[in-house]
Amino acid sequence: MEPQEERETQVAAWLKKIFGDHPIPQYEVNPRTTEILHHLSERNRVRDRDVYLVIEDLKQKASEYESEAKYLQDLLMESVNFSPANLSSTGSRYLNALVDSAVALETKDTSLASFIPAVNDLTSDLFRTKSKSEEIKIELEKLEKNLTATLVLEKCLQEDVKKAELHLSTERAKVDNRRQNMDFLKAKSEEFRFGIKAAEEQLSARGMDASLSHQSLVALSEKLARLKQQTIPLKKKLESYLDLMPNPSLAQVKIEEAKRELDSIEAELTRRVDMMEL
């Protein structure tokens, strides 16, 4: 028989033994459940064996105690003609209490020499238990404080998480809005670029001078701006010349020439812009 089938058979026999006449609950038979139930059956078997050994040992000790008690009873009867049956009700209660105490303290007999060490050991165990109980109590108080602090921290963290989620949601909305605006601007930029290109192609087909193109006009505008910047120090220099007494007519002529050159450039730029608008 295969090991798996053998385990299933052992498990089935164990379950039948456990439940007896009662129906066995349904369960899925697979290697995993079989392994778990087989492990439980083995542990149950070991436990039953240990319990059986303990019971047998207790039976043997009980038999020994009964024999010893009978021997002591016979000895008392022979020596002092004493029997538990001859005791009063109070004496019987005292005797039973003495026996119960000996059993509870696990002494070998009811002598004072056995009771005193047993009571001392029990007292020591009591003090150790109290000390351990105090340690556990202190530890529990620490755990309660730590738990309270942890709960407060958890609440703060939850609030921080909520705030972070709200901030993240707001920022995400802003990013989405910016992305939409950027896409719109890109689309418009492409639209304008194609529109400018189409207009330039139309103007070129109509015989427009290439110097009137958008790029040329931009370059010309930049050149004009540079020239204006260059004329600023010249104007300042000429203004200083105007303050000089010698030969003011010549300085005035130079100024007029510079003005005419600047007006000519501005007129040319205006003309080209006007032609572009047509």
Swiss-Prot record:
**Primary subcellular site in the record, as a coarse category:** cytoplasm
**Location in or out of the cell:** Cytoplasm; Cytoplasm, Cytoskeleton, Microtubule organizing center, Centrosome; Cytoplasm, Cytoskeleton, Spindle; Cytoplasm, Cytoskeleton, Spindle pole
Keywords from UniProt, A to Z, are:
Cell cycle, Cell division, Coiled coil, Cytoplasm, Cytoskeleton, Microtubule, Mitosis
According to UniProt, the tissues expressing it are described as: Widely expressed. Expressed in pancreas, kidney, skeletal muscle, liver and heart. Weakly expressed in lung, brain and placenta.
Which terms in the GO cellular component ontology are assigned?
centrosome; cytosol; HAUS complex; mitotic spindle microtubule; spindle pole
List the GO biological process terms.
cell division; centrosome cycle; regulation of microtubule nucleation; spindle assembly
Q: Which residues form a coiled coil?
A: 49-79, 124-177, 249-277
The misc remark on file is:
HAUS1-depleted cells retain functional cell cycle checkpoints, but the depletion decreases the G2/M cell cycle compartment and induces apoptosis. The protein level remains constant through the cell cycle.
Regarding protein family, the annotation reads: Belongs to the HAUS1 family.
As for what it does, the entry says: Contributes to mitotic spindle assembly, maintenance of centrosome integrity and completion of cytokinesis as part of the HAUS augmin-like complex.
PANTHER family, alphabetically? HAUS AUGMIN-LIKE COMPLEX SUBUNIT 1
Please give the subunit comment from the record: Component of the HAUS augmin-like complex. The complex interacts with the gamma-tubulin ring complex and this interaction is required for spindle assembly. Associates with microtubules. The interaction with microtubules is strong during mitosis, while it is weak or absent during interphase. It is unclear whether this interaction is direct or indirect. Interacts with EML3 (phosphorylated at 'Thr-881').
This chain's protein is named: HAUS augmin-like complex subunit 1
Query: What broad taxonomic lineage does this protein's source fall under?
Result: Eukaryota, Metazoa, Chordata, Craniata, Vertebrata
